[in-house]
């Protein structure tokens, strides 16, 4: 019930970065954090919040290439609040461990969080090699080094028969 994310876990995947906003059950303070999940144990539950009763995840995304989006946070109207909406860029938040508390986003009650814009990767490019023996591209360092590629980069492969392929 109430599943936020389902995905295939890749061992030693350091590029998948999770962005999250949660409300602490005890204080009501909203925290923002970015984290990578290096390893997991099967059939074990991990608490991504502080662990206090009543804590709730308000926003969650999984980014396979470390993208950092910009969110718009709308606060519930209160008498002393002047600014009811503000933007927060996940690129300004450091990538920490899964068990970290995170940074304080706001101490006020949040009405809703919406995605303003999808960001670009905050990680370095992937290093790609071509292995002529198996005729494949790889990230393991086997074969001839082609270069470092970003998420939006494409590789043009031209074959002997004149055909080509973008990958």
What positions do the PLM features span?
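C-terminal interaction appendages of subunits in large macromolecular complexes
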Residues: 1-167
């Amino acid at each position: 019930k109430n599943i936020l994310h389902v995905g295939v876990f890749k061992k030693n995947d350091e590029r998948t970065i999770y962005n999250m906003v949660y409300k602490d059950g005890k204080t009501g303070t909203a925290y923002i954090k970015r984290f990578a999940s290096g390893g997991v144990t099967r059939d074990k539950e991990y608490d991504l919040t502080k662990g206090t009763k009543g804590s709730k995840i308000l926003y969650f995304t999984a980014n396979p290439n470390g993208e950092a989006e910009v969110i718009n946070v709308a606060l519930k109207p209160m008498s002393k609040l002047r600014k009811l909406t503000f933007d927060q860029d996940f690129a300004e938040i450091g990538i920490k461990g899964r068990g970290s508390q995170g940074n304080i986003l706001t101490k006020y009650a949040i009405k809703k969080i919406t995605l303003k814009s999808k960001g670009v990767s905050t990680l370095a490019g992937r290093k790609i090699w071509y292995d002529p023996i198996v005729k494949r591209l790889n990230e393991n360092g086997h074969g001839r080094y082609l270069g470092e590629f970003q998420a939006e980069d494409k590789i043009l492969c031209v074959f002997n028969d004149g055909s080509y392929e973008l990958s």
